[in-house]
């Protein structure tokens, strides 16, 4: 199939909510980037595909881990053994998905990107998938995943701060996810709040320069930054258990 046909099939798979197949079609497209960089549309389709595939497993993992904690609290050892085994199966799927996109980013997408916007997009994506690994890995593997996340986000941030406007949806999405990393993986609420607040304040001060095409995307991410700040600042004073927001919607909202 041609590049155009693979893109069309990826859109069809998205409509049918068959995200594993959407990933397959977009991987074929991504492997042609030696010739030509992915378009914004193609880049977003790839991101949406992977985000849905990983998102389902991340949700499953959280539910199963929560049940495991409850069963441990009840002293239900037989159930705990079964749950651990099942959780291991989900973790194997998570690892495979993350490894797939990280290989693709390293072999094709990051090296072929020339524009600042696409470099930040792919490096942010690299950070995101290392972060997803850090969510469930333990010991040395978790440390390695966290370090790789930091390196990717930092590289993306350096380019974003130099070349993208504070209101740019990709720069904002990066700040959002980087701050989530500080909060959830590194357990650094102060750093998380500072990063999110700075990104929000800088964007607010330049809101009047925002073009119509990215206004919706940028303001949506700014709202998520503010939601997290509210949650985190209340968490610093009390132990809250609400859900942290990250750049989701398949990350497509950041790439317009």
From Swiss-Prot:
Which positions make up the signal peptide? none
Q: Which GO terms describe its biological process?
A: protein localization; signal transduction
Q: Kindly state the tissue distribution recorded for this protein.
A: Expressed in seedlings, internodes and panicles.
Q: Which cysteines are joined by disulfide bonds?
A: none
* InterPro entries for this protein: 14-3-3, 14-3-3_CS, 14-3-3_dom_sf, 14-3-3_domain
Q: Which SUPFAM superfamilies match?
A: 14-3-3 protein
Q: Where in the cell is it found?
A: Cytoplasm; Nucleus
CC terms in the record's Gene Ontology section: cytoplasm; nucleus
Q: Where is it predominantly found?
A: cytoplasm
Q: Which PROSITE patterns match?
A: 1433_1, 1433_2
The record's induction entry says: By wounding, drought and salt stresses, benzothiadiazole (BTH), ethephon, methyl jasmonate (MeJa), hydrogen peroxide, abscisic acid (ABA) and incompatible and compatible races of rice blast fungus (M.grisea) and rice bacterial blight (X.oryzae).
Q: Which Pfam families match?
A: 14-3-3
Which keywords has UniProt assigned to this entry?
A: Cytoplasm, Nucleus
Instruction: Specify the domain of life of the species encoding this protein.
Output: Eukaryota
Q: Describe the family membership recorded for this protein in Swiss-Prot or TrEMBL.
A: Belongs to the 14-3-3 family.
Provide the assembly information.
May form a complex with the transcriptional activator VP1 and the bZIP transcription factor EMBP1.
Protein purpose? Is associated with a DNA binding complex that binds to the G box, a well-characterized cis-acting DNA regulatory element found in plant genes.
Q: What is this protein called?
A: 14-3-3-like protein GF14-C
From which source organism is this entry? Oryza sativa subsp. japonica
